[in-house]
From Swiss-Prot:
Example GO biological process: cytoplasmic translation
GO molecular function (one): structural constituent of ribosome
GO CC annotation terms, alphabetical: cytosolic large ribosomal subunit
Protein name: Large ribosomal subunit protein uL6
Keyword S-adenosyl-L-methionine (UniProt): no
Gene from which the chain derives: rplF
Highest taxon above the source species: Bacteria
Pfam family, one: Ribosomal_L6
Family: Belongs to the universal ribosomal protein uL6 family.
Free-text function comment from the UniProt entry: This protein binds to the 23S rRNA, and is important in its secondary structure. It is located near the subunit interface in the base of the L7/L12 stalk, and near the tRNA binding site of the peptidyltransferase center.
Keyword rRNA-binding: yes
Length: 177
């Protein structure tokens, strides 16, 4: 039995949810998100909460149960509060600058790296070594953060690179003579 799946997702005031044609659509103060529903799971809107239960007692349905409940929860949280990820850049000459719908990174390559910001996401650079990505879709926010980090992952000897805020970089000792 899924301990996550058996809890219903509360719908706060100001948020509207509806199910039609295999799609759950959630509207809130920050925007609208939708989720394609799985046939293995039953979704019911009961008053001010969304109940998620397996459609049958197969192993596959039970394994989807908790994940589908979390995806529904992320829709509701996204349209009410939104999501954000913070990246920290460390290294000599490494810097970032947001220019409209483009993020310009200087990461020690012979050229600047320009990353296009997808629709629905916002990128801010409060200073040259911090990048804040925010939006209502948790998957899109995490994907953009991962793509930015991919350009220079933190290296273990000096700790240079792009890392998530709060990420621990395992450090190694250099060669000894």
């Amino acid at each position: 039995m899924s301990r996550i799946g058996k809890r219903a997702v509360a719908i706060p005031s100001g948020v509207e949810a509806k199910i039609d044609n295999g799609t759950l659509t959630v509207k809130g103060p920050k925007g609208t998100l939708s989720l394609g529903l799985s046939d293995l799971i039953d979704y019911k809107i009961e008053g001010d909460e969304i109940a998620v239960n397996p459609a049958n007692d197969t192993q596959k349905a039970r394994s989807y149960w908790g994940m589908q409940r979390t995806l529904v929860s992320n829709l509701v949280e996204g349209v009410t509060e939104g999501f954000s990820k913070t990246l920290e850049i460390s290294g000599v000459g490494y810097r970032a600058q947001a220019q409209g719908k483009t993020l310009k990174l200087q990461l020690g390559y012979s050229h600047d790296v320009d990353i296009a910001v997808p629709e629905g996401l916002e990128v801010k650079t409060p200073d040259q070594t911090t990048v804040i990505i925010s939006g209502i879709d948790k998957q899109a926010v995490g994907q953009l953060a991962a793509e930015i980090r991919q350009w220079r992952k933190p290296e273990p000897y000096k700790g240079k690179g792009i890392k998530y805020q709060g990420e621990y970089v395992f450090r190694k000792e250099g060669k000894k003579k």
